[in-house]
Amino acid sequence: MTFVETVAVPDNEERPSAGHNRPVADSTKCPNAREMKVQNRVAQRTHHRRLKTKLEVLRERLKEPEKQVGEPARVQTSTSTLVSDAATSLADSMCLVPAVQNDQAMAFDFLMTPSPSVGNDCPSNDLETMRQAASVHSNTLGGAFPLNRSPCTENMTPESQVSLSTAPLCFTSVVPAELDMDAFCTLDSSDWSRPNEESLLRLANYSTSVSPTNVQWGVDENAPLQDRVRYMRDQAVAMGFGSLDDVVEAHYTQKLECTSPSFQEQRLSRNRRLSRLLSTLHNAAKDWSEWERRGLQEQVTQGAEDILVSELNSYITQRSMNSTDDKIITGGLLDEQSRLRQDVEERRRLQDSLPNLGALLTTLLSRSNAPNQDARRDTVLAMIKTMCFDQDENMSIS
């Protein structure tokens, strides 16, 4: 503000000293100078009073937060009820809806999708990660929102009100309701950034022993194999499967929709990966105990029997419909050259119609020190003819 300064000059109008260079206002030449001076002083005093009033108001406003900071934080006896809603919603998001449990294709797609992350600052099995998550102090939130309280706490009783700015955001958002958080709660808000080692171990033990329907923290790809297998087993159970074996069984046997992403994956697995899987199981079973591999060997043997019997029955049915085969079986009147030609055709037909049975008999003869390759082929042909002879006799009698 600019102030107009006037200097009263005596009646004799003495000249100012030579060293005084400031101009002097003459009241005779400026008749309103005194009035302007009075008005300026009044305006200045009014402005000072307004500033003083504003300062007093600001001081009163600052006194109330200072009192709240000085008072100890009142914490509820157990904070599990405050975090139950958030934990339940997150746990529900990990569980399957009935539609997914009843739909194998949808369950496969959901199982192969990475589980939703709850944030890098949330507690995990690593104690160091939990320490970093727990180090979120109230000052971090207080800088932007000083001493703000949630509107939902206005109607709560004083015993159940908890200052949201003094609690770590991670613990109040995703901690399961079943986990007792009393060990993390202290009367001093500064202790939030330094939870004791026992509390961290309790949280770590809970996260490793949690049931599949509860919160899943996820497993890193560099984790030990047993941890990754256990995580996939828990995910399979959460998808509605009984075990990982049920997942593999459904993957190879269930009829999936053509539009499902798992459909092409299933076809590729049946054609290429299944044979490699069976070979790996067969080789690995050699190191298992007799009790462990008994079931696998029985199923493999039974499956081989079904395949060989089915091939033989199909071949017999095909032979019975071909009249020329009767001459080969009964040794009809054919010259030596015609008989040799018939034998070659018969071997070729055997290779096409009985690939597995022929391979099995050839392998057995090769390990029994048979004389030569031609003799093994003749022996295989004779064995197959013998197996078909009784069937042909029964058909001719009937």
Swiss-Prot record:
This is Transcription factor kk1f. Transcription factor; part of the gene cluster that mediates the biosynthesis of KK-1, a novel cyclic depsipeptide with 10 residues which is a promising active compound with high activity against many plant pathogens, especially Botrytis cinerea. Positively regulates the expression of all the genes from the KK-1 biosynthesis gene cluster. Keywords: DNA-binding, Nucleus, Transcription, Transcription regulation. Residues 1-28 are annotated as: Disordered. One of its GO terms (molecular function) is DNA binding. It is found in: Nucleus. Its main location: nucleus. Residues 34-50 are annotated as: Basic motif. Residues 31-62 form the bZIP domain. Pathway: Secondary metabolite biosynthesis. GO terms for cellular component: nucleus. The keyword NADP does not apply. Disruption phenotype: Decreases the expression of the entire KK-1 biosynthesis cluster genes and almost eliminates KK-1 production. Belongs to the bZIP family. Disulfide bonds: none annotated. Residues 51-58 are annotated as: Leucine-zipper.
